[in-house]
């Protein structure tokens, strides 16, 4: 294999991969290949990505958990500035790990990437003052196909780092803060998603 190190089936969940590109540094700075199709195929990952996206979010923002139902997306995600805790939840009905989650800290410093196959819900929490988040997807956004699930469903039990608060029966951000007092910040839509038992299955 060339310029990447791949950890497969992280958290015991089939298909989830953590990818670490080789970083070549010297006194001037560094260089790395953030994506190389040949290296990915040599690692057994053969995915055709069609779009790159980038977002900026401030500390305490939680985006998710999202998916597309009829046009599911595989995502390759990374943080190019700041730090996020990135989460994938298995929604594949026939999977032995249905309803299980795994989380990875992604940062500009560790340069890790998280590969999330089709059939998962995905989201992230921003832990730094700001974070820029980049992701490749293998299908386009379809506005009428959006799905989601509650980020704090106790049946799933995601352990969001630095987050304090008490579950009150919904995905509302009310009462949740980070350890430094920063209020949790979710979109109105993301505060209305339901739990696993009422969520779409692939």
Tell what function each PLM region has:
Residues 1-109, 128-130, 137-202:
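Non-catalytic, conserved peripheral segments adjacent to functional cores
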Residues 114, 122-127, 135:
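Short beta-strand His + acidic residue motifs that chelate non-heme Fe in jelly-roll/DSBH
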């Amino acid at each position: 294999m060339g310029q990447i190190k791949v950890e497969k089936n992280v958290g015991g969940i089939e298909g989830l991969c953590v990818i670490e590109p080789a970083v070549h540094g010297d006194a001037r700075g560094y260089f790395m290949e953030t994506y190389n199709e040949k290296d990915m195929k040599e690692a057994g990952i053969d995915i055709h990505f069609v779009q790159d996206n980038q977002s900026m979010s401030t500390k305490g923002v939680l985006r998710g958990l999202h998916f597309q139902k009829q046009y599911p997306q595989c995502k390759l995600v990374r943080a190019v500035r700041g730090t996020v805790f990135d989460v994938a939840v298995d929604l594949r009905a026939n999977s032995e790990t249905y309803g299980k989650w795994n989380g990875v800290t992604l940062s500009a410093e560790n340069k890790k990437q998280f590969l999330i196959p089709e059939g998962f819900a995905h989201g992230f929490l921003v832990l730094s003052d700001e974070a820029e988040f980049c992701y490749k997807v293998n299908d386009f956004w379809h506005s009428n196909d959006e799905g989601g699930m509650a980020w704090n469903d106790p049946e799933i039990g995601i352990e969001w780092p630095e987050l304090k608060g008490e579950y009150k029966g919904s995905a509302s951000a009310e009462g949740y803060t980070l350890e430094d007092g920063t209020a949790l910040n979710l979109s109105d839509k993301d505060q209305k998603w339901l739990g696993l038992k009422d969520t779409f299955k692939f």
